[in-house]
Amino acid sequence: MKSTRPFHPTPVITIDGPTASGKGTVAALVAAHLGFHLLDSGALYRLAALASVRYGIAAEDIDALVKLIDDLHITFREGCAQLDGVDVSNDIRAEAVGNRASAIAVHGPVRTALVARQRAFRKTPGLVADGRDMGTVIFPDAVLKVFLTASAEARATRRHKQLMQKGFSANIDDLLRDLRERDARDSNRAAAPLKPAADAKLLDTSALSVDEAVDQVLQWYRALGQPA
């Protein structure tokens, strides 16, 4: 059946899913394989969250958050996330920052302030965008939409390993509880709740290696007649 999606000359692959489902790693490797640009939308939210904490802006102060986002100087360079010219890649991965990012994302105006920045990442030859609503809200015309899933236990284990490798202390039981609470909050929020697009490919990564997940995404992309 012929697609009814609006045509856009620059292809986008969206990879959505809950926290610690592996979407960031998979997206980065798919982008590297295809030579595409990469958008880590979660990093944008975390950068805004980190800045809000540093400037003393409450998670409920919507007007101040929107103004902050409009004024932020954000850049991504060689895998590093920079805020006001300073590499904060490790800072934004702290659990407290992740929880703040999820808390401010419930506000529609805050999300609107970041949408334009996310869409601006779409450049030739293509883009791989990872996040939570890339396929449903930001790039509804993406040529391939993938939604990664994994059990809460598997995701908590992955998150614990990531944090320990970065030098953060973490309790796996606390992480599991936080993940479940964040899943419930993100799935039930009024603005762009976490859910797969109707035409998304579902990929459970609980028992898959990173390479296996990447290979599956590339197979789906090739099946569309795209070079991969």
UniProtKB/Swiss-Prot annotation:
CDD domains: CMPK. InterPro entries: Cytidylate_kin, Cytidylate_kinase_dom, P-loop_NTPase. Gene3D superfamilies: P-loop containing nucleotide triphosphate hydrolases. It is found in: Cytoplasm. It catalyses: CMP + ATP = CDP + ADP; dCMP + ATP = dCDP + ADP. It is an enzyme of class 2 (transferase). It holds the Pfam family Cytidylate_kin. GO terms for biological process: nucleobase-containing small molecule interconversion; pyrimidine nucleotide metabolic process. GO terms for molecular function: ATP binding; CMP kinase activity; dCMP kinase activity. GO terms for cellular component: cytosol. ATP binds at G17, P18, T19, A20, S21, G22, K23, G24, T25. Its EC number is 2.7.4.25. It comes from the Bacteria. Keywords: ATP-binding, Cytoplasm, Kinase, Nucleotide-binding, Transferase. Belongs to the cytidylate kinase family. Type 1 subfamily. This is Cytidylate kinase. It comes from Burkholderia cenocepacia (strain HI2424). The gene is cmk.
